[in-house]
Swiss-Prot record:
Record: residues binding chlorophyll a 5: K211, Q229
Gene (UniProt): CAB2
Record-given protein name: Chlorophyll a-b binding protein 2, chloroplastic
Free-text comment on the cofactor: Binds at least 14 chlorophylls (8 Chl-a and 6 Chl-b) and carotenoids such as lutein and neoxanthin.
InterPro entries for the chain: Chloro_AB-bd_pln, Chloroa_b-bind
Main location: plastid
Taxonomy of the source species: Eukaryota, Viridiplantae, Streptophyta, Embryophyta, Tracheophyta
Modified residues (Phosphothreonine): T38
Compartment(s): Plastid, Chloroplast thylakoid membrane
Residues bound to chlorophyll b 4: Q163, R174
Residues annotated as transmembrane: 98-118, 150-170, 218-238
Record's function text: The light-harvesting complex (LHC) functions as a light receptor, it captures and delivers excitation energy to photosystems with which it is closely associated.
Length: 264
C-alpha cells in the first residue's frame, strides 16, 4: 500500500484520474493499478539511457550536469571540464568520438592480427604495425599480406592519392548521401543504408550503440598504448606482451618509465 500511495502521489499521476489508466485486465483497487504501471515502466527502461542510467561522476563531480540527460549512448553524467555544455560543440565532439572510436577499433585489430599470424607461421614480410609502412621504400615495395600477387605498392604518392579519393568519397556519402539515397543519420546505419538490418529492432540498436562507444573508447586507449610502446620499446604489442609475461618484474610500464632515455 505504501508503494501504491507513493506512485499515486507522484507527478506522473498528478491531475489524472486513476480510472483512465489502461490495463490489460480488470483490476480492483487503486494500488494494483499503480503498481502495474510502475512495473511496465521499469521493464522497458534501459540502464544506459535516461536520468536513472548508470553514472560515473568521478572524484571531482558531485552530481551530473543538467545538460547531460542520458539521451545519447555513452553518457555517464561526467563532464568535469564542461566540454559538453555547448550543444554545438557537444554534437561535434560526439561525432568525432564515434568516428575515431571506429577507426581505433579497426586500427587495434590491424596492429595485433598480423603479428598474431606471423607468430603462428604466416609470412608477412613485416608484421609489426609501425614498421610495415616503411617497406614501400624498399626495393621490392610494399606487398599486401606479404603476397606479391596481391596489391604491390611502390609509390607513396599513389597510396596517398587512393586514400584521399576513397576515404573522401566514403565520408562524403556518409554526410551528404550517395547512390543509395538520403542520409537518415550520418553517424549510424538506418534508412537507405543498413545492409545488416542493425536498426530494425530499436531497443537492440540502442544497446549496440552503447557497446560500440564503450569498445571504441577502449580501442582509442589501446592505440595510444601501442604508440607509446612503439616509441619506448621499438616492439609490437604482442611481443611486448610476451616479454612482460616472461619477465614481469623487468618488463613493465614502471621499469621502462624509470629507465627510458629518449634517443637511445
Amino acid at each position: 500500500m505504501a508503494a501504491a500511495t507513493m506512485a499515486l502521489s507522484s507527478s506522473t499521476f498528478a491531475g489524472k484520474a486513476v480510472k483512465n489508466l489502461s490495463s490489460s485486465s480488470e483490476v480492483q483497487g487503486d494500488a494494483r493499478v499503480s503498481m502495474r504501471k510502475t512495473a511496465a515502466t521499469k521493464k522497458v527502461g534501459s540502464p544506459w539511457y535516461g536520468p536513472d542510467r548508470v553514472k560515473y561522476l568521478g572524484p571531482f563531480s558531485g552530481e551530473s550536469p543538467s545538460y547531460l540527460t542520458g539521451e545519447f549512448p555513452g553518457d555517464y553524467g561526467w563532464d568535469t571540464a564542461g566540454l559538453s555544455a555547448d550543444p554545438e560543440t557537444f554534437a561535434k565532439n560526439r561525432e568525432l568520438e564515434v568516428i575515431h572510436g571506429r577507426w581505433a577499433m579497426l586500427g587495434a585489430l590491424g596492429c595485433v592480427f598480423p603479428e598474431l599470424l606471423a607468430r603462428n607461421g604466416v609470412k608477412f614480410g613485416e608484421a609489426v604495425w609501425f614498421k610495415k609502412g616503411s617497406q614501400i621504400f624498399s626495393e621490392g615495395g610494399l606487398q599486401y599480406l606479404g603476397n606479391p600477387s596481391l596489391v604491390h605498392a611502390q609509390s607513396i604518392l599513389a597510396i596517398w592519392a587512393c586514400q584521399v579519393v576513397l576515404m573522401g568519397a566514403v565520408e562524403g556519402y556518409r554526410v551528404a548521401g550517395g547512390p543509395l539515397g538520403e542520409v537518415v543519420d550520418p553517424l549510424y546505419p538506418g534508412g537507405s543504408f543498413d545492409p545488416l538490418g542493425l536498426a530494425d529492432d530499436a531497443e537492440a540498436f540502442a544497446e549496440l550503440k552503447v557497446k560500440e562507444i564503450k569498445n571504441g573508447r577502449l580501442a582509442m586507449f589501446s592505440m595510444f598504448g601501442f604508440f607509446v610502446q612503439a616509441i619506448v620499446t621499438g616492439k609490437g604489442p604482442l611481443e611486448n606482451l610476451a616479454d612482460h609475461l616472461a619477465d614481469p618484474v623487468n618488463n613493465n610500464a614502471w621499469a621502462f618509465a624509470t629507465n627510458f632515455v629518449p634517443g637511445k
